[in-house]
């Protein structure tokens, strides 16, 4: 499990996700709007929109909010025009960090992101400085209650690249182009997923502890707390014990 996934899991267990539900809703609504704008308003024909709608349902977002966000994206309702930008930089200990943003004010966002890096002993870099250290993949997370051998067989037959047996869950990795096909095959075979998304997987990990670990978690928390930031990917590895102590 990547450092970011561990961090998200612990945050969810401790209820931090619930405390920030308003921010979570804001980010999902932006993603639904942009996905509908780029690929149309039908989730069945738009994988990005389907993933965003699934996230909204998992967070118990009211159906009206979802439909309104889709209509803003397709132009049926008036909405804000968001620009997608990715910022890159380094966290404490040389950790590679990718920050995906959706903003209606590029100047505000770049200033906020740069300031956050600096305050947490990191620094923002040039475009391309760390993106080569990540691979774009489909990631489908399945509960440990599932039969691993059957999951492995169904996933690979549908075109998955790998199925990993992690500490808390099974993780099915796919190429982005086969993500929807694998996901649908798993659903048909009765495997309910805990999450399914296109994400950035780090090629190598940087082990952190002590002050560097503490500052890295602060950086993640502050970046994700920014309304303009949609996703943060980083290649840090902090032990579960240390992470639980620091959070």
Curated annotation (Swiss-Prot):
Main localization of the protein described in the UniProt heading: cytoplasm
Presence of keyword Acetylation: no
UniProt record, GO biological process: regulation of DNA-templated transcription
Transcription found in the keyword field: yes
Sorted UniProt keywords: Cytoplasm, DNA-binding, Transcription, Transcription regulation
Family indicated by similarity: Belongs to the TACO1 family.
Protein name: Probable transcriptional regulatory protein Gmet_0743
């Amino acid at each position: 499990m990547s450092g970011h996934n561990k961090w998200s899991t612990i945050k969810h267990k401790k209820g931090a996700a619930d405390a920030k539900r308003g921010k979570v809703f804001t980010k999902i609504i932006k993603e639904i709007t942009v996905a509908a704008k780029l690929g149309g308003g039908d989730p069945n024909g738009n994988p990005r929109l389907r993933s965003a709608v699934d996230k909204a349902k998992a967070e118990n977002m009211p159906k009206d909010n979802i439909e309104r966000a889709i209509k803003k994206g397709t132009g049926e309702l008036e909405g804000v025009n968001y620009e997608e930008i990715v910022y890159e930089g380094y966290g404490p200990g040389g950790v590679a960090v990718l920050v995906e943003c959706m903003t209606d004010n590029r100047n505000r966002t770049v200033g906020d992101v740069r300031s956050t890096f600096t305050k947490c002993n990191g620094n923002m870099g040039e475009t391309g400085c760390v993106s080569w250290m990540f691979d774009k993949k489909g990631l489908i997370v399945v509960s440990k209650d599932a039969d691993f051998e059957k999951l492995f067989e169904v996933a690979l037959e549908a075109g998955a690249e790998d199925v990993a047996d992690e500490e808390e869950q099974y993780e099915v990795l796919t190429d982005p182009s086969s993500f929807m096909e694998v996901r649908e095959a798993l659903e048909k075979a009765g495997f309910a997923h805990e999450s399914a998304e296109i994400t950035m997987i780090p090629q190598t990990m940087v082990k952190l502890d002590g002050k560097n670990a503490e500052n890295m978690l602060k950086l993640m928390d502050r970046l994700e707390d920014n309304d303009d930031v949609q996703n943060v990917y980083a290649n840090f590895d902090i032990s579960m014990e240390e992470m639980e102590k620091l959070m």
